[in-house]
Amino acid sequence: MYKRQDGTILHVAVTLRDHPIPIIGVNFGGKGFLAGLEDDELDMLLEIADGQYTVSRRMMLDVELVRNERIICTQSVLNDVVIHGGHVDCIGVTAYGDGVPITRFNGDGIIVATPTGSTAYSMSAGGPLVEPENENIIMTPICAHSLAGKSFVLAPGRQITIVPERIHDRPAILVADGGDSIALIRGDQIRIRRSDNYTLLADTGIRSFYETAFGKLTDRL
């Protein structure tokens, strides 16, 4: 599968979530953390077609939007869920783990990511990099206005509930894996938990996660 952005793989991952089929991406531009091959490594596709690869199993998240005690939307993600105030608005965010408050802050929003998604928006917002085959839930604030807005790396079994607050004239926004925006209103809750499904990525063994991160994130001296 050829790709220009990781969004292509994210779309395929959700499409195949009920089917254990390994995915391989070829990066033709950009950071391309999910791509197993670069555009000058196309000859490796023949070896992959011959079964010369290992499988990297990646955790996914299931997301539920709850409104007036009813689930009105469900999605699965490989990378992340983003709740934000739109282009201009600051919102309040309260996050719960298994019903217990974890953090509350005002800011632009919050990202809830998988280890695979730790190299995406969460990283840009100052979140930690987590080895992609680990199973953790990563919460990263977006431009928090207080010291309470810190990143958390949580156990995979936690059920996370995000409650956006201070929603006034404009709705807050929910985005799952960079897809379509969903408007949030006062009183909405977003419930997030580890999915029973996994994404399988074909791993050629050409480079490790650390080599990929170093090559894509380090400036040339």
Outline where the language-model segments fall.
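Gly/Ser/Thr-rich active-site loops/lids in small-molecule metabolic enzymes
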Residues: 104-148
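Catalytic core of DAGKc-family lipid kinases
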Residues: 30-108
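Short glycine-rich anion-binding loops that position phosphate/pyrophosphate groups of nucleotides
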Residues: 5-8, 31, 116-118
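A glycine- and small-aliphatic-rich helix-loop capping segment at beta-alpha/alpha-beta transitions
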Residues: 16-21, 39-44, 126-135
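Gly/Ser-rich helix-loop-strand patches that form or flank binding pockets
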Residues: 11, 15-28
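ATP/nucleoside-binding phosphotransfer catalytic cores, i.e., glycine-rich phosphate-binding loops
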Residues: 83-84, 88, 98-101, 150-221
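A generic structural signal for short beta-strands and their flanking turns/coil linkers
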Residues: 57-61, 77-79, 89-93, 108-110, ...
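Conserved small/polar residues in nucleotide/adenosyl-binding loops
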Residues: 1-2
